[in-house]
């Protein structure tokens, strides 16, 4: 077992916050407070009139946020898909100058064996971002069919051995009274089911990702947040999103591309470009940003991060 504990280092900290083009008197949302790296930097750029609202599903993130003694700051224990509801309750719909989302699982969540996210540390097989709601991974695996599990592994983990792994997991649970309940127990069953090992990647990597995404409805949450962002943002409001795997990044990229594209109009028609742009809700800001080699060296977990920024017209 790997006992190395990674200090939590906020990925693309300055790039993501710079992407918000902070207005000192603006109103901002950090949809994924985590351990507060982005939030604290945003607060440092705001005037006394500025405001920051943060959300997070993780009770431990909420506890960390409650240590911030700042009248400009407010934390709400909810998923970032509920940002429109939060804004409505606060009378801020259409008044938000920027939203930052840092997707995926954080280092403290991975490193805390009790959370059940890591296949490198033995702990209860939980995987819930919000430990107060829903089924744990162990509870779900105890009742899922092999077909449904294979679908989850294939869809959310792009796992090539999805059927083989699913069959092994479900068969094991059917054959014993004490179902799979520990992270390393599941990791070993997966490893035994995979015929070819990738020397650069643990055989349980994709399966753990897939189960975590499913348990937390991560892609549904992201889809809801993206679809509601335009109604929440003020004109010229920024969207700054960090993703860590191709499924998330694909969704963010397609959303920004779709909403920044004008109509295809035949050449020669007497229509001004400004008229065409009236109905285009977003403008993409720059190219996708990846971590520098220096950041990757300092924090290897940042390697797969991709930051995309867009602005509401």
From Swiss-Prot:
Residue intervals passing through the bilayer: none
Enzyme class: transferase
GO-annotated biological processes: rRNA base methylation
Compartments reported by the entry: Cytoplasm
Keyword set includes Transferase: yes
Binding site for S-adenosyl-L-methionine: 36-38, 56, 80, 102, 109
Keywords from the named record: Cytoplasm, Methyltransferase, rRNA processing, S-adenosyl-L-methionine, Transferase
Catalysed reactions, as listed in the record: cytidine(1402) in 16S rRNA + S-adenosyl-L-methionine = N(4)-methylcytidine(1402) in 16S rRNA + S-adenosyl-L-homocysteine + H(+)
Gene Ontology MF terms in the entry: rRNA (cytosine-N4-)-methyltransferase activity
Principal cellular location given in the protein's record: cytoplasm
Job description of the protein: Specifically methylates the N4 position of cytidine in position 1402 (C1402) of 16S rRNA.
Cited NCBIfam families: 16S rRNA (cytosine(1402)-N(4))-methyltransferase RsmH
HAMAP family registered for this protein in UniProt: 16SrRNA_methyltr_H
Family indicated by similarity: Belongs to the methyltransferase superfamily. RsmH family.
Name this protein carries in UniProt: Ribosomal RNA small subunit methyltransferase H
Phylogenetic classification of the source organism: Bacteria, Pseudomonadati, Pseudomonadota, Gammaproteobacteria, Pasteurellales
């Amino acid at each position: 077992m790997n006992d190395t504990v990674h200090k939590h280092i906020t990925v693309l900290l300055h790039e993501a916050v710079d992407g918000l083009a902070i207005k000192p008197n603006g109103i901002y949302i950090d949809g994924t407070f985590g351990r507060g790296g982005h939030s604290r930097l945003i607060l440092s750029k705001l005037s006394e009139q500025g405001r920051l609202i943060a959300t997070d599903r993780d009770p431990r993130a909420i506890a960390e946020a409650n240590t911030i003694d700042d009248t400009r700051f407010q934390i709400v224990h909810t998923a970032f898909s509920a940002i429109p509801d939060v804004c409505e309750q606060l009378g801020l719909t259409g008044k938000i100058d920027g939203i930052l989302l840092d997707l995926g699982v954080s280092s403290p969540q991975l490193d805390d064996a009790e959370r059940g996210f890591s296949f490198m540390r033995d702990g209860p097989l939980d995987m819930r971002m919000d430990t107060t709601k829903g089924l744990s991974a162990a509870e779900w695996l105890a009742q899922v069919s092999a077909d449904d599990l294979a679908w989850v592994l294939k869809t959310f983990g792009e796992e090539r051995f999805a059927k083989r792994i699913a069959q092994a997991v479900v068969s094991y649970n059917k054959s014993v009274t004490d179902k799979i309940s520990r992270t390393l127990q599941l990791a070993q069953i997966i490893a035994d089911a995979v015929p070819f090992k990738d020397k650069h990647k643990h055989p349980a990597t994709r399966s753990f990702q897939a189960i975590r995404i499913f348990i937390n409805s991560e892609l549904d949450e992201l889809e809801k947040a993206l679809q509601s962002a335009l109604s929440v943002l003020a004109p010229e409001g920024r969207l700054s999103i960090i993703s860590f795997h191709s499924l998330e990044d694909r969704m963010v990229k397609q959303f920004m591309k779709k909403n920044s594209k004008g109509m295809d109009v035949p050449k020669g028609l007497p229509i001004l470009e400004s008229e065409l742009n009236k109905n285009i809700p977003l403008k993409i800001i720059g190219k996708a940003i990846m971590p520098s080699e220096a950041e990757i060296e300092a924090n290897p977990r940042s390697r797969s991060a991709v930051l995309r920024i867009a602005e509401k017209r």
